[in-house]
Amino acid sequence: MSRIDQSKLELEERLVTVNRVAKVVKGGRRFRFAALVVVGDKNGHVGFGTGKAQEVPEAIRKAVEDAKKNLIEVPMVGTTIPHEIIGRFGAGNVLLKPASEGTGVIAGGPVRAVLELAGLADILSKSLGSNTPINMIRATLQGLSELKRAEDVAKLRGKSVEDLLG
């Protein structure tokens, strides 16, 4: 898969979580902040990143930088996805279903951020298993990256879309 040039995209960023993490040392606890950010252009490109620093703004900046390096392209059919899929990562499973126009984004928490920034306006989703934000986001992106349009499948098989759909 080729890397997506983020300089040509108008990316919007959304902060999903900021966690305070502690390292216990002899003199007490040392606190740092871990940020989780999703970026997307609302036109089929989305990515996520994590950043860790001693200050919150710096952690967010690092997370945004990381997210811009991990962009994926989402195949879309109008305002939804081509077919149903279950994204899996660790113990987190996310069911993604195409929806008819006007349905809106039916998703919870971190999954909603990913789907909205990808530009999907009509989609149903259900989070199964782990509810850890990072696992949910990774499962969603894994599912979105495995989607295929009917045209792409037909081309791979050397058939027309009409032959494929019967």
Swiss-Prot record:
- Identification of the protein by name: Small ribosomal subunit protein uS5
Q: Which family does it belong to?
A: Belongs to the universal ribosomal protein uS5 family.
Q: Known PANTHER family for this protein?
A: MITOCHONDRIAL RIBOSOMAL PROTEIN S5 (PTHR48277:SF1)
Q: What does this protein do?
A: With S4 and S12 plays an important role in translational accuracy. Located at the back of the 30S subunit body where it stabilizes the conformation of the head with respect to the body.
Q: What cellular component GO annotations does this protein have?
A: small ribosomal subunit
Q: How does it assemble?
A: Part of the 30S ribosomal subunit. Contacts proteins S4 and S8.
SUPFAM superfamilies in the record: dsRNA-binding domain-like, Ribosomal protein S5 domain 2-like
The organism that produces this protein has a lineage beginning with:
Bacteria, Bacillati, Bacillota, Bacilli, Bacillales
Q: Where is the S5 DRBM domain?
A: 11-74
Question: Which species is listed as the source?
Answer: Bacillus pumilus (strain SAFR-032)
What does the record list as GO biological process? Answer: translation
Q: What information about domains appears in the record's comments?
A: The N-terminal domain interacts with the head of the 30S subunit; the C-terminal domain interacts with the body and contacts protein S4. The interaction surface between S4 and S5 is involved in control of translational fidelity.
Entry keyword set: Ribonucleoprotein, Ribosomal protein, RNA-binding, rRNA-binding
Q: Name one GO molecular function term.
A: structural constituent of ribosome
State the InterPro entries in the record.
Ribosomal_Su5_D2-typ_SF (IPR020568), Ribosomal_uS5 (IPR000851), Ribosomal_uS5_bac-type (IPR005712), Ribosomal_uS5_C (IPR005324), Ribosomal_uS5_N (IPR013810), Ribosomal_uS5_N_CS (IPR018192), Ribsml_uS5_D2-typ_fold_subgr (IPR014721)
